[in-house]
Design a protein with these regions (language model features):
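Active-site SXXK
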Residues: 30-36, 56, 82-110, 118, ...
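Short, surface-exposed loop or secondary-structure junction motifs
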Residues: 115, 120-361
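Positively charged n-region of N-terminal signal peptides that target proteins for export
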Residues: 1-4
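Short, conserved catalytic-motif segment at the N-terminal edge
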Residues: 25-83, 103-105, 122-126, 398
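Boundary at the C-terminal end of the N-terminal hydrophobic targeting segment
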Residues: 19-23
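Short, surface-exposed beta-strand/loop micro-motifs that present aromatic residues
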Residues: 366, 373-386
């Protein structure tokens, strides 16, 4: 892999492709274009797309590279990507809407809503003969614990016991077509933090309590009110040409990843909608979710969440429990990932929270997360901006992508020194 070389000066000038935004009579110049082009031109990334916005909407976007492995279709900022676990924020918003309506309670054990979850077991490991060692769960997780990843559910890609259980046939793999939601817990609810399938169960709760399939709930209560016309579980045939090939690292090369490519599907045809992943979207569409959060839960005269609910999303809901690095158990799927980027972190309602910000520029209590195919976002309410950076590469936490993301963030924040983005919506 060639090293990404980007020289980004603190003194910014206008170049072709720079984005300019007017704020209270001042001119603000954003030029992260060089960061993105450098990574693509060096061959570190085949495709990259990025966007920056504030409470008034998207103010800058740019794409570089190609949508396809044959390099016949140039990248565009309105390309549709698979956002994977960025779906989790949408599912969390849906669940919080039901909390506001009284259909869910954050601290009620979920077997009150899903009786079949009574009597859960915890997988503690294996004996010398590969026999699973179970103990009874003290109780079912709560809705809050599902949202904060303290429920005990994990992913086999970052948990060696869960990976071993899937390999031995003790549980269904989350990467297959089986009933992976029936997996045991990895720890007693509320005692630890580990990223996992909790948000899939949260999506199931949304369906159960709203009596609506998740795709339909999202469309009616989130996508349509926010004007998100390019966000789908089932991609329409007419939009397939706007999608991006998922690539995988193969030594110093990038090759198409098997079985993970975009495909068109008829609306309503999926048997299972994953609350933890599966959406297609554009950065412009997803940015409207982040813009809504910067506006305290409302956009275009539509209230998606109450302001106090949005405030709660950016607050610590795990106490002294520390979100840990995601230690890989499946290197082809993910590298070991430090989503806190070396800074102190906690977890809110659906967001990793940086109480002290991070060195790349995010301010105190910025919320963030990511998607498996190396798409990343952050919402910085103190600065009044959001940012999204996306590729379509495996494994997750790709070194070249993370390096480019860090430089992109520094470019965004350097470009606004001495200026503050307006928080008022248009």
């Amino acid at each position: 892999m060639r090293r990404i070389l980007v020289i980004f000066c603190g003194c910014l000038t206008l170049h072709n492709g720079a984005a300019i935004a007017q704020e209270s009579g001042a001119t603000m110049v954003i030029e992260p274009k060089a960061v993105i082009e450098s990574a693509v031109n060096a061959g570190d990334l085949a495709f990259a797309v990025a966007a920056v916005g504030n409470a008034g909407g998207e103010i800058w976007s740019y794409a570089s590279g190609h949508k396809d492995a044959d390099k016949k279709r140039a990248a565009s900022s309105n390309d549709i990507i698979q956002i994977a676990s960025m779906t989790k924020l949408v599912t969390t918003i849906a669940a919080l809407q039901l909390v506001e309506r009284g259909a869910l309670e954050l601290d009620t054990p979920i077997d009150a809503y899903v009786p079949e979850l009574a009597g859960l077991q915890v997988l503690n490991g294996f004996d010398a003969n590969d026999g699973p060692l179970f103990e009874q769960a003290s109780r079912a997780p709560t809705t809050r614990e599902l949202i904060t990843h303290t429920a005990g559910y994990v992913y086999e890609s970052w948990n060696s016991n869960a990976r071993r259980a899937a390999n031995l046939g003790v549980t269904e793999s989350a990467f297959g077509s089986g009933n992976f939601l029936a997996s045991p817990l990895a720890f007693q609810p509320g005692t630890n933090w580990e990223y996992g399938i909790s948000t899939d169960w949260l999506g199931a709760l949304v369906e159960r309590r709203s009596a609506t399939r998740l795709a339909n709930y999202f469309a009616k209560n989130i996508f349509q009110p926010l004007g998100m016309d390019d966000s789908h579980y089932e991609l329409p045939e007419g939009k397939l040409h706007r999608t991006v090939t998922v690539m995988a690292r193969a030594g110093d090369s990038l090759v198409p990843a098997p079985m993970l490519q975009p495909q068109a599907m008829e609306a309503g045809s999926m048997a299972f909608y994953s609350g933890g992943g599966g959406l297609y979207s554009t950065l412009s569409d997803y940015g409207r979710v982040l813009q809504m959060l910067l506006n305290g839960g409302s956009l275009n005269g539509m209230t998606i969440l109450k302001p106090e609910t949005v405030d709660a999303m950016f607050s610590n809901h795990v106490g002294d429990i520390q979100p840990a690095a995601l230690t890989t158990a499946m290197p082809s799927i993910s590298n070991t990932a430090d989503m806190s980027f070396g800074a102190p972190a906690t977890f809110g309602l659906g967001l990793l929270i940086h109480p002290q910000g991070i060195l790349n520029g995010r301010r105190s209590n910025t919320g963030s997360w990511a998607g498996l195919f190396n798409s990343y976002y952050w919402v910085d309410r103190e600065s009044g901006i959001y940012g999204i950076f996306g590729t379509q590469i495996l494994p997750f936490y790709d070194a070249a992508t993370i390096a480019t993301l860090a430089q992109f963030e520094r470019a965004v924040y350097s470009s606004k020194v001495g200026s503050k983005l307006t928080r008022s919506a248009k």
